[in-house]
Amino acid sequence: MKRDVRILLLGEPKVGKTSLIMSLVGEEFPEQVPLRAEEITIPADVTPEKVPTHIVDYSENEQTDEVLREEIVKANVVCVVYDVTQEETIDKIRTKWIPLVNGGAEKGSKIPIILVGNKSDLRSGSSMETILPIMNQFSEIETCVECSAKNLKNISELFYYAQKAVLHPTAPLYDPEDKQLKAQCVRALSRIFSISDQDNDHILSDAELNCFQKLCFGNPLAPQALEDVKTVVWKNTSDGVQDNGLTLNGFLFLNTLFIQRGRHETTWTILRKFGYDDTLELTDDYLYPVLRVSVGCTTELNHLGHQFLLKLFEKYDEDKDSALSPAELKNLFSVLPYMPWSSTVYSNIPLTDDCYISQHGYLCQWMLLAYLDVHRCLEHLGYLGYPILMEQECQTSAITVTREKALDLDNRQTQRTVFLCKVIGPRGTGKTDFLRAFLQRSTERSDRDPGAPSIYAINTVSIANQDKYLILEEVDVETEFLKAADAACDVACLMYDVSDPDSFNYCASIYKQHYMDSGIPCVVLGSKADLVEVKQHHGMSPSEFCYKHRLPSPLHFSALLTHTHTHIYSKLTWAAMYPHLNGSDMSSTSFWLRVTLGATIAAMLGFALYRAFSRHK
């Protein structure tokens, strides 16, 4: 909504433009009227809409045509004043003033016009019969007000309508020639209907209508008022009411009726509550609320985000099979102007046996998005109606920004639940199979997977009876060069092919170049463990290398034995959670034992504190 309103008064000489302004300000008819009134500014606190309003007078005798053109450009609304007793001043509306204001403007970008019939005290009848054909000819005319500067009749109403034409414009909502809502307005209201239809039955029940009414206007409708609304819709539409509720067509008809009856502000209140601006686009403030993430911090969905997303999942899981089919997923995202999840999502997350997105996989994908691109995540939550349905100021309440990693290291514990593991190794070592195995997919099933290839896989790993999210990112490079940004992560998995004698050279080089002094935990993984292990051409064997650099002994993986490798993903998660134990001992057994003991002690301490707190209460 505009922050201020600029009203320009035009019309033939002696029609009373200046008198109208002075009567409004002085609240009495002026005895002496100057040729032109100075610009008046009405403070926000004395206007009905609480917006500062500037009123500008124009006089042909004092101002040039160039000044007039400049004032028209600056104006938000133009009041064309005519004398109800002088027919020629009415004719000038059509032949002079409207062409002057909007002659070169395209449809939809015209300045709104209010027709003002002054000196109604000098005429017994109304001029509306003469004015109506003009109003029908020019769609930019919002309304016509007959008033009297002398009797102060309709003076405040005149400026209220002018203000309203700017703050609640008709043009973006309604086409007066076609007598129907514009396509952009239909799209916006359809999204609002979909968000408000909380059970996805395509009908707004009484409970949903009251929820909607309270959200937009602060109070629920009285039962009789609710019935009256439905009766009006039922009488005027063939499909507006169904099962005692309002359909989308009924909802659209109701808003059309508001506009046709001059109650544009009702529809605008609804639109603005759901984040729309004057062009019927969602505002940047709504879609992209400010969220500051310091260096070393990460972002995760919190309990509010989970709660909202689970409600959304249940709403669109129409067959209640705890999975979203492609059609159900498309419906879920129908309130967005584009499909936000590409086919790679099916390669990122665990799927059902039918290759549908399970509830668990759905939450995994949202966690992945929140971690990798939190601002895109906020945008998606905004489109889906998170602030409205969760009654929150904005989407940032769904996100937790974790504390800096350096503080976690100092405290030797973390409250984070999402960790990133870079899987690094030369091409052909089996990194993709390692990611697929994390999602419990066999190599035989790869032909059935609907997803496009992805460099990410996310799943949960149970650590001390708590689920943590582990993101695996495949880093595939042709040479031994790896940028520092590519190396940053919570834990690095350096993968080599046990059957390729040159494979480990790459891992050793990457470790020395990026991880040896980084403090990032590293786990060496020998892939293709079902094949015969050959001696590596590196100066040391992988085990000797790990011993020398105080790394845990190498782990082994085979894509043919996916069900036996759960412990590998657990150990990667452990290492990410407790980086301070990295390199604390050369023995693999001792390393994992220290990690396990650390986690157990932390869990026991937390339980003891909980019991002590409970007793105190």
Curated annotation (Swiss-Prot):
Residues noted as binding Ca(2+) 2 in the record, renumbered to the chain: 317, 319, 321, 328
Catalytic activity, EC: 3.6.5.-
Top-level division of the source organism's lineage: Eukaryota
Residues involved in Mg(2+) 2 binding: 432, 474
Catalysed transformations (reactions): GTP + H2O = GDP + phosphate + H(+); ATP + H2O = ADP + phosphate + H(+); UTP + H2O = UDP + phosphate + H(+)
Keyword tags: Calcium, GTP-binding, Hydrolase, Magnesium, Membrane, Metal-binding, Mitochondrion, Mitochondrion outer membrane, Nucleotide-binding, Repeat, Transmembrane, Transmembrane helix
GO biological process, one term: cellular homeostasis
UniProt binding sites for Ca(2+) 1: 197, 199, 201, 208
Mitochondrial intermembrane-side positions: 614-617
Uppermost EC category: hydrolase
A Pfam family hit: Ras
Entry GO terms, CC: mitochondrial outer membrane; mitochondrion
The EF-hand domain, residue ranges: 184-219, 304-339
Predominant localisation class: mitochondrion
Biological function: Atypical mitochondrial nucleoside-triphosphatase (NTPase) involved in mitochondrial trafficking. Probably involved in control of anterograde transport of mitochondria and their subcellular distribution. Can hydrolyze GTP, ATP and UTP.
Record-given protein name: Mitochondrial Rho GTPase 2
The organism of origin for this protein: Danio rerio (Zebrafish)
